[in-house]
Amino acid sequence: VHLTGEEKSAVAALWSKVNVDEVGGEALGRLLVVYPWTQRFFESFGALSSPDAVMGNPKVKAHGKKVLGAFSDGLAHLDNLKGTFAQLSELHCDKLHVDPENFRLLGNVLVCVLARNFGKEFTPRVQAAFQKVVAGVATALAHKYH
């Protein structure tokens, strides 16, 4: 991902304030609610029958935290996202057979959650930088599919 120095600083500054536990659970939960077909990859998580069930599901929250932990690793290696996410790309492609479009959807949901959580601090300029990052992460995660 090509970010200017200013964009990298904006992303790092905002991300340093993110509560990975909460934001991860909310982002994954929203993905499962807004795009219900993504739930098929999480059948072992139990109750996903309603938005409240999804958003309150401890397994969704735990996996969301794990997802954002990996995203945090990516932020530390913006110049090598493909390498950073190579193993996760292989896992999601070869073993889990996740539709790579889901990575893009999750990135966009994450941007929505950040906007909701940070309000005016999540300026259009910050959003533009994050959109580049989530697009780069989605591309890196989809790499094994090509």
UniProtKB/Swiss-Prot annotation:
Annotated keywords: Heme, Iron, Metal-binding, Oxygen transport, Phosphoprotein, Transport
The protein's assembly and partners: Heterotetramer of two delta chains and two alpha chains.
Any GO MF annotation of the entry: haptoglobin binding
Family statement drawn from the similarity comment of this UniProt entry: Belongs to the globin family.
InterPro entries: Globin (IPR000971), Globin-like_sf (IPR009050), Globin/Proto (IPR012292), Hemoglobin_b (IPR002337), Hemoglobin_oxygen_transport (IPR050056)
Stretch forming the signal peptide: none
Residues that hold heme b according to the record: H63, H92
Domain of life: Eukaryota
CDD domains assigned to the protein according to its UniProt record, in alphabetical order: Hb-beta-like
Phosphoserine modification, residue list: S50
Record's protein name: Hemoglobin subunit delta
Domain Globin residues, every copy: 2-146
Protein's GO biological process: hydrogen peroxide catabolic process
Expression sites (tissue/organ): Red blood cells.
Record's keyword annotation contains Transit peptide: no
Organism: Leontocebus nigricollis
Membrane-spanning segments: none
Gene Ontology annotations for the cellular component aspect, listed alphabetically: blood microparticle; haptoglobin-hemoglobin complex; hemoglobin complex
Gene this chain is encoded by: HBD
